[in-house]
Each structure stands twice: as structure tokens, then as C-alpha cells.
């Protein structure tokens, strides 16, 4: 008898080797926000094309290889708790690290500001924030950090040198929040992928999916007033039915996101830390994940031809819309397009501690010259650019073309 399709569970674990036949899925019950859809799984059948003697005769079809895909849709919910103190990675952050490439805390714990300047505030802690990482400063409407994200150049003893200045000089005791950074690898040899196995459960059938890896993801709901989410597409090397107990008892996370409100968009010439916040109406990031499927022998299942995958270059495009300038011969956004200087950008989703995130892109090359258009009955300009590898070669984090900090 058919049961409600709204009921389901997806649990996972990382694999020791690609596609290994192991049946534990206890790392996390993924906090999905859309029903479990198994319809993308396939076990191919191939026409035998045998020559027959009668006009409409035929023969049994050949059983082919397994594969297919499924999707997981999650909220971009931030860290789930304050990062003013000690920081431990959550299960969702760890999962998204597998998707994009890496995950690491900016600092093992947050700290407090003691003074300094907007571009080089001083902190109680010494040398704890990683170069290239994201943090958050103060609270909304404090006229200083404002609860907004910042990007770190270096943390030299107690001086926190910033790539993106704060809104004002911090006051002694203002909170300096750590964050969890999710970012891609940039080294030319960093192409390996940790495969995962998932258990897709419904109130009827359940499926074990082995040799799983991300092939795409979409960032959604980044405009003011929207609910930020991410949807990941997972390829599957082989699968089988499961009779594992449902409902699952694997632990999950139920953190609610902040709506996109109270945040900011910093855009300035790359290398210039002076705060330059743009008043945006729409914001979008199109992240095309570079992933190549490897087919070959040696699979652990008789119907498995996918035996691995490798990362290839990603494509990261950022687009945002602003109101048109007053009459002028030098409007700002079109000037971004005609200039030859690359930008760096920092997006803050919201200001609520534990439910926000920031996105920093150290090198954005504008790919169009904005021309005025009518958008929602108002004159507006849309600017877009491609995010590329940063110029600071300290480590993968400083190089990363895209980094998301959850706090």
C-alpha cells in the first residue's frame, strides 16, 4: 500500500574507497527540505536488436549498468549556534565541504576586539584567525562591525589585518566571531573527491546509493527577503534496495536560517580594503561545479561502470542589480565594466549570530558593461563578473576563488 511521499530520510557516511560495499550510514540524517525523490536512479535496459523472422517479433532486453542521480535541498542555515566561543564543525558544514572541496574553522574560537582601526582592529586573542578566512564583527546597528562579515588578510599577534574594512572602529569588548569556511581547492593537483554513500528512505521503498559524488549545486534565495538554500545533485555509481528501519534514528540538525535581511554587499577594487557597500536589489551566484566521471573496470558491483571522479575547473559567475544612477556621464556600474581593474566582493546574508553566512570572492573580473533596463517598473542596472583564483598564494584558503563562512 502506498504511503505519504512527504515522509522520508537521507543519511550518509564517507567511503574509505570508492563505491565500497558497506552498509553504515550514521554520520548525519541530512536536514533536507524537499521530499526524497528516488526517480533519478537508473538500472539501464538495452535493446538486444536481435534479428527476428516475423514482422513484429522481438526479444528480451539486456540488463545494463546502474547509475543515475538524486538531489538534496538544504537551508543555508549558518552554524546553528554562536561562534563567539569554541567552534565545532556541524554535520551540514562537513557535508558541504565534501561538495565544494574543503571545510575549516576560521579560528578555533571567537574572541573580542580591543580597539584598533577599521582595517586593522586589535583582538584579545593572538594569531588565531587563518589567513583568507571569514569572520563576523559586532552587532547590527552598532555603527562599527554591524554584525557583518569580514575577510582576513593576516592575524599578526593581536592585530587582525583585514581585506575588507569594518564599518567603523571597533570598541573594546565588541565580539569578533569565528566562522566555518567552505571553499574549493585551487592547487592544480587537488582533483581528488571523497565519495560518499547515502541511504534514501521513504515510507515505502528504500535505496542504498554507493559511490556518490556531487556533480552540481545551486545557490538559491540570495535576494533580500528570501530564504537561502542550496540544492546539490549527487551522481550514483551503484545502488540496491534496503530494508533498514524507517523512521531512522540517526541524528540530524534542525537549524533555521535567517531570511536575507540586514546584510550587505561590499564591492571594491581588488586589494583595496576601504569599505564600499553597494545597495543591491537582487544578487545571484551561478556556480558550475567542475566534475568528470571516470568509467572503468574494478567496480565492486556487477553493474557498476563508474569507478571514480575528478575535479576540473569550476565556473563561478556573480550577478547583482542596483538602482540606476541619477543623470551622469560616469555611472558607477557601467564604469566597472569599462575599467580593467578586477574587484573583490563580500556578501553578508544576515546579522543574526548562528544563522548567517558570508561569501567572499577575492578576484572578480567584470564580464559585461551594464546598460539601464526596466526592472519591477524601475530603472536599474545589472552587473556581472566571473570569480577567479585569488592572488595570495599562502594556502588554498587565500587562493580560493569562492569561500563561504557560516557563523
Regions found by a protein language model. Name each.
Residues 1-407:
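Signature of extracytoplasmic/envelope-associated structural regions
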